[in-house]
From Swiss-Prot:
One of its GO terms (molecular function) is nucleic acid binding. This is Ribonuclease H. Belongs to the RNase H family. The gene is rnhA. Its cofactor is Mg(2+).
Length: 152
């Protein structure tokens, strides 16, 4: 892919009050000096769905193909995209226990978005002082508190 593509950093986090229960996500996009924050709410969801939707929201906000560094504290999202997804596809969307892959709708949505960009996936430990991850966590928790549905 071309080096002329803009480099965008996306940070995302999901949260759930109960699992399942009301959930939210927070996403921060940074391109140079520009920063954009997104959040969303779902009244009945799971933590993993919110983690996926945080990444999806960030990628959906991009208006043209970009080089993307996507950072999340979700091993589920990070390993899902870097280690597991191709095996799931080969096995007809079955996991290692031969069960249907959870959240297939969101994984497929994420795959379509990733195909438009050059994405590298990065994991950070949650609640460990990573400024952007902490901000995304604040946005996700505020979305739950507000019950807002700005993106979902």
């Amino acid at each position: 892919m071309s080096e002329s593509r803009s480099m965008v950093e996306i940070f995302s986090d999901g949260a759930c009050s109960g699992n399942p229960g009301p959930g939210g996500f927070g996403t921060l996009l940074r391109c140079g000096e520009r920063v954009r924050e997104l959040s969303g709410f779902d009244p009945e969801t799971t933590n993993n769905r919110m983690e996926l939707l945080g990444a999806i929201a960030g990628l959906e906000a991009l208006t043209r193909p970009c080089r993307v560094r996507l950072t999340t504290d979700s091993q589920y999202v990070c390993k899902g995209m870097t280690e597991w997804i191709h095996g799931w596809q080969k096995k007809g969307w079955k996991n290692s226990k031969k069960e249907d892959v959870a959240n297939r709708d969101l994984w497929e949505r994420l795959l379509v978005l990733v195909s438009k960009h050059e994405v590298s996936w990065h994991w950070v430990r949650g609640h460990a002082g990573h400024a952007e991850n902490e901000r995304c966590d604040e946005l996700a928790r505020q979305a739950i508190a507000d019950g807002c549905s700005s993106v979902v």
